[in-house]
C-alpha cells in the first residue's frame, strides 16, 4: 500500500498542511518534471485541498501519478482519496490491458468504501481529477466534479476533464429524485446544497449524485509540453488560457505552480487554491 501513496518527501516540501506548501520532483530519467503549490483559502475551516504528485516504478513501468482532490464539508474524504484512489486503480487486475475500465471500476469501489466508512469519514465529499502517465508516453485523465485538467500540445490548449455542474446535469439529477436550485446571487446547487453534480462521498446527497468519472486518454509526444491540474480556486478566477500561459511561460514547474496560486490570490480567489504543473520538455 505504501508504495502507491504519493506524499512528497519532506525535503521537497515547503510550508505546512494548514496554510501553504509547495514542492517538486522529476521522473527517473529526469526528462519530465513536476511542481505543485497549495494555498489555504479565506474560509474559516481547515485546508480541504489535497494533492498527489509522484513517480513510481511498478512491473518494469514508470508511472507518473498526479491528482487534485478538493474537499467540502471537511477534509476526511480528500485525505482518504490521497491515500487510496491510485492504489485502488493499480490494484485492478486488468489495469495494464484496459486502463479505462480499471479507472472507472476503482472510482466506483473507492466511493463505495467512503460511503461505507461515513461513520469515520463523515458526510462530506470531494472532487477528484487524476492523471496517470505510463512510461512517459500515455496519459489517462479522469475526473468527477469541477477540478480540472488542461493539456498544452503543439501550441493548442485542450481541457482534458469535464466540469460536472448541476446546471448541465440537471436531467440526471432530477431522474434520481433530486432538484437543482438556482437562487439569485448563487450558483446552481444540487438540492440547494452542493455546487457540483458528481463527487466522492456526500452520503446525504448520494442518491442524487454520481461518482462516475469522465475519462480521456492522450499520447505524449515531442509536441506535448505542459499538463496542469487545479482546483476551482484557480478556475473561478482564471480561464484555461490564462492559467496555461503562466504554466508554459515559467519553465520551472514549482515556480509556475506558485505563480499560479499567487495570481489566483491577486484575483481575490476566496477558495482553497491548489495546482500541479507537469512539464514534459
From Swiss-Prot:
Residues 33-280 form the PPM-type phosphatase domain. GO terms for cellular component: nucleus. GO terms for molecular function: metal ion binding; protein serine/threonine phosphatase activity. Pfam families: PP2C. Its cofactor is Mg(2+); Mn(2+). It is an enzyme of class 3 (hydrolase). Binds 2 magnesium or manganese ions per subunit. Its EC number is 3.1.3.16. CDD domains: PP2Cc. It is found in: Nucleus. Disruption phenotype: Abnormal hypocotyl elongation under continuous red light. Mn(2+) 2 binds at residues 70, 232, 271. Mn(2+) 1 binds at residues 70-71. Disulfide bonds: none annotated. The keyword Metal-binding applies. Coiled coil: none annotated. InterPro entries: PP2C, PPM-type-like_dom_sf, PPM-type_phosphatase-like_dom. It catalyses: O-phospho-L-seryl-[protein] + H2O = L-seryl-[protein] + phosphate; O-phospho-L-threonyl-[protein] + H2O = L-threonyl-[protein] + phosphate. Keywords: Hydrolase, Magnesium, Manganese, Metal-binding, Nucleus, Protein phosphatase. Involved in the regulation of phytochrome signaling. May regulate phytochrome-interacting factor 3 (PIF3) through the dephosphorylation of phytochrome. Interacts with phytochromes (via N-terminus). Belongs to the PP2C family. This is Probable protein phosphatase 2C 9. It comes from Arabidopsis thaliana (Mouse-ear cress).
Amino acid at each position: 500500500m505504501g508504495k502507491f501513496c504519493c506524499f512528497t518527501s519532506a525535503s521537497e516540501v515547503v510550508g505546512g498542511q494548514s496554510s501553504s506548501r509547495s514542492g517538486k520532483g522529476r521522473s527517473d530519467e529526469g526528462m519530465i518534471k513536476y511542481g505543485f503549490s497549495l494555498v489555504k483559502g479565506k474560509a474559516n475551516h481547515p485546508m480541504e485541498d489535497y494533492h498527489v504528485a509522484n513517480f513510481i516504478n511498478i512491473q518494469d513501468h514508470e508511472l507518473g501519478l498526479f491528482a487534485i482532490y478538493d474537499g467540502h464539508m471537511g477534509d476526511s474524504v480528500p485525505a482518504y482519496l490521497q491515500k487510496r484512489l491510485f492504489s485502488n486503480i493499480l490494484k485492478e487486475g486488468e489495469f495494464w490491458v484496459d486502463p479505462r475500465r480499471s479507472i472507472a471500476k476503482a472510482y466506483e469501489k473507492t466511493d463505495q468504501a467512503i460511503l461505507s466508512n461515513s461513520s469515520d469519514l463523515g458526510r462530506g465529499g470531494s472532487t477528484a481529477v487524476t492523471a496517470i502517465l505510463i512510461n512517459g508516453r500515455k496519459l489517462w485523465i479522469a475526473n468527477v466534479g469541477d477540478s480540472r485538467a488542461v493539456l498544452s500540445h503543439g501550441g493548442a490548449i485542450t481541457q482534458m476533464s469535464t466540469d460536472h455542474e448541476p446546471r448541465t446535469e440537471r436531467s440526471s439529477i432530477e431522474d434520481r429524485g433530486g432538484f437543482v436550485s438556482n437562487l439569485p446571487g448563487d450558483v446552481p446547487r444540487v438540492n440547494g446544497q452542493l455546487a457540483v453534480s458528481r463527487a466522492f462521498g456526500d452520503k446525504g446527497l448520494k442518491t442524487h449524485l454520481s461518482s462516475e468519472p469522465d475519462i480521456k486518454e492522450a499520447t505524449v509526444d515531442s509536441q506535448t509540453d505542459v499538463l496542469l491540474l487545479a482546483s476551482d480556486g484557480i478556475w473561478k478566477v482564471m480561464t484555461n488560457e490564462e492559467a496555461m500561459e503562466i504554466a508554459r511561460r515559467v519553465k520551472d514547474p514549482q515556480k509556475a505552480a506558485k505563480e499560479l496560486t499567487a495570481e489566483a490570490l491577486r484575483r481575490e480567489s476566496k477558495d482553497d487554491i491548489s495546482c500541479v504543473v507537469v512539464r514534459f520538455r
